[in-house]
Amino acid sequence: MAKNTTNRHYSLRKLKTGTASVAVALTVVGAGLVAGQTVRADHSDLVAEKQRLEDLGQKFERLKQRSELYLQQYYDNKSNGYKGDWYVQQLKMLNRDLEQAYNELSGEAHKDALGKLGIDNADLKAKITELEKSVEEKNDVLSQIKKELEEAEKDIQFGREVHAADLLRHKQEIAEKENVISKLNGELQPLKQKVDETDRNLQQEKQKVLSLEQQLAVTKENAKKDFELAALGHQLADKEYNAKIAELESKLADAKKDFELAALGHQHAHNEYQAKLAEKDGQIKQLEEQKQILDASRKGTARDLEAVRQAKKATEAELNNLKAELAKVTEQKQILDASRKGTARDLEAVRKSKKQQVEAALKQLEEQNKISEASRKGLRRDLDTSREAKKQVEKDLANLTAELDKVKEEKQISDASRQGLRRDLDASREAKKQVEKALEEANSKLAALEKLNKDLEESKKLTEKEKAELQAKLEAEAKALKEQLAKQAEELAKLRAGKASDSQTPDAKPGNKAVPGKGQAPQAGTKPNQNKAPMKETKRQLPSTGETANPFFTAAALTVMAAA
């Protein structure tokens, strides 16, 4: 750009010099021709001098035409990026030819002819002065045109810079929107994974509940069979057993209801996830629409830039066509100033619009953060509800196990009162094995529930503080459970000591004889004397809680503790 400007200035200086030289030379030639026409006809050298002057006049005419042609080419090619070196070379050749013609014109013979003809030097000097003034005026006009061109180029350059800055800012805004979209997609992916994982956990829980129901049905059926065998001699025990079964079924129904409530809580969380997912999809669509708007704005800016370029070309063409008219150039400058002001106003309006869009986007992001915080709190509440439901299920399971142990203990007492029949003893042992198996299955289900709860806690991504609180709660519960089991172990030891003391003082009753050929081994929890009525047999109670002692329940509790 600087090189082109330097070449242009040099060309203008050469043009001024060449124009002045041509004007002076033409003036001198004209004066010489006039003087040659008035010379006397009898002079011997006038013919040759006249011919020489005519030749010089033709030569100067050709030089004048060349200078006008070069000037016209300069104006025509200026807007198309003319080659400054070529133009300077042509001006040098024109200058050289002018100097050669001027030297020929100002030779000794010409000076003698001028002296003889008596040309008025004063008039020639006056004409030369007038011509120089005219040349200076034209040079001033050319300088003014040059200044106007420089100002127009500055205005066009300013417009280019402004549009380039707007284009860069639009690209940056588009990149920021794309980053926001990618972040939202990244946030949606783990939410979708959590929803899928929650669905899988719900399906697993449903399957576990069905399995638990089937196992409880099998256990109930086996218990019914055992009690039907014992019902032949103990109808009262059968009634109590039916009452216990009904109570157990009601408690099982309550446990099912609690589990269904927990499942509903999980379903509610799943629905909230789905709603949040739909909301995120809507936000992504909105951001994509904003991106399309920005793309359209960028294309509009490119069209405006192309229009500005076309306007620049049109302006340059108009300046080339209106160089001789200073008033029109001034008017064109005013038009350019008005266009620049209008462009500035448009740019300011675009900036305000973009600023409002960015502020609206920031508000939307803040609202999304608030919604996410509320959702997190809701998930926390759901997690607490799930924990409470788990605790309630564990409590109900423990109660069911205790009731079942009590029923089994009563069944064992009833079976022990049937004169030590081997069949009843085997049934009691089989019932004991089934109870232990049911306890093991219950323990495995409890472990599965704990694992499920752990998975839920991990899926909610608890903070370090919440993890510490949960760990403290679990440790406190484990400690309390250990203390309770220690107490039960002590009570079991006391119970065994009392049972040993009771077994040393059997109470014999006449009328009941041992069956020959059948060994009657003593059972745990029963006295060796089988002659007492089953309903009057004394039940041992725990000194701490007042409940009936059950060695099988105590062993099951120890097994649960070991598993924990």
From Swiss-Prot:
Ranges annotated as biased composition (Basic and acidic residues): 404-413, 421-438
> Which segments of the protein form a coiled coil according to its record?
44-505
The record's C repeats, renumbered to this chain, cover 285-319, 327-361, 363-397, 405-439
Pentaglycyl murein peptidoglycan amidated threonine modification sites are: 545
Positions of D repeats: 472-477, 478-483, 486-491, 493-498
GO molecular-function annotation terms?
A: actin filament binding; microfilament motor activity
Keywords, A to Z, come to: Cell wall, Coiled coil, Peptidoglycan-anchor, Phagocytosis, Repeat, Secreted, Signal, Virulence
Primary location group: secreted
Name of this protein: M protein, serotype 12
Source species: Streptococcus pyogenes
